[in-house]
């Protein structure tokens, strides 16, 4: 964000505000990788677009799409993978649109059909390391609906241990306590 925007910004708990002039992008990335940083970081700079391009250049970009799917009972489709609650999502195939990928991934990961794609809810970014490469994953999140009444079937070869329908109350009481911050943000926008 620019200095003018930063002057009006109130940082939430665990968010650190840094100046681009005080640390290089590489130093910032090393700090994030070491785990010795705040939960969130806001970078103040004169040219946010240029800073973003420099940040993205440090990673291999991966693009994914997923959905917040509601059934006819207004329950939300969730998955449990690698010890966390999550939403179904996955990488785009070559020449596939984010919306088409979201529908395909939900169907593959949960065995649910009759999906209707709704509007784009949110776009998130998160980083991880895979085979010693730094990955920046951009995920498009869509609102979706289904009339499929079948019980979800988890895609075990994707390490999905469970796929189930939760009420909004269950999402707030169970899901939110054990999920990723970016996924929680997506669901909060959808509820």
Which positions does each model-derived feature cover?
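Short connector loops at helix/strand junctions that flank enzyme active sites
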Residues: 60-65, 80-82, 137-139
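Charged phosphate-binding loop/patch that engages nucleotide di/tri-phosphates or the phosphate backbone
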Residues: 182-191
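N-terminal leader/capping segments at the start of a protein or of a new domain
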Residues: 1-34
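Acidic, metal-coordinating catalytic segment for phosphate/diphosphate chemistry
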Residues: 22-66
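Conserved beta-strand and immediately adjacent loop positions that scaffold enzyme active sites
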Residues: 66, 75, 162
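Active-site beta-strand termini and strand-to-loop segments that position acidic
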Residues: 69-72, 144-146
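Unchanged
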Residues: 92-181
């Amino acid at each position: 964000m620019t200095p003018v925007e930063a002057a009006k910004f109130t940082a939430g708990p665990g968010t650190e505000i840094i100046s681009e002039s005080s640390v290089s992008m590489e130093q910032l990335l090393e700090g994030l990788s070491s785990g010795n940083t705040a939960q969130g970081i806001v970078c103040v700079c004169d040219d946010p677009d240029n800073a973003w391009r420099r940040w993205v250049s440090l990673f291999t970009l991966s693009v994914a799409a997923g959905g917040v799917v509601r059934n006819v009972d207004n329950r939300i489709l969730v998955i449990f993978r690698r010890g966390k609650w999550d939403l179904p999502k996955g990488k785009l195939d070559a020449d596939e649109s984010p919306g088409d990928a979201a529908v395909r991934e939900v169907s593959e990961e949960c065995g649910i059909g009759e999906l209707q794609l709704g509007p784009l809810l949110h776009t998130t970014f998160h980083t991880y390391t895979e085979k010693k490469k730094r990955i920046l994953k951009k995920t498009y999140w869509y609102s979706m609906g289904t009339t499929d009444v079948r019980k979800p079937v988890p895609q075990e070869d994707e390490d999905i241990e469970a796929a189930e329908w939760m009420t909004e109350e269950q999402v707030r009481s169970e899901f939110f306590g054990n999920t990723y911050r970016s996924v929680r943000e997506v669901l909060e926008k959808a509820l």
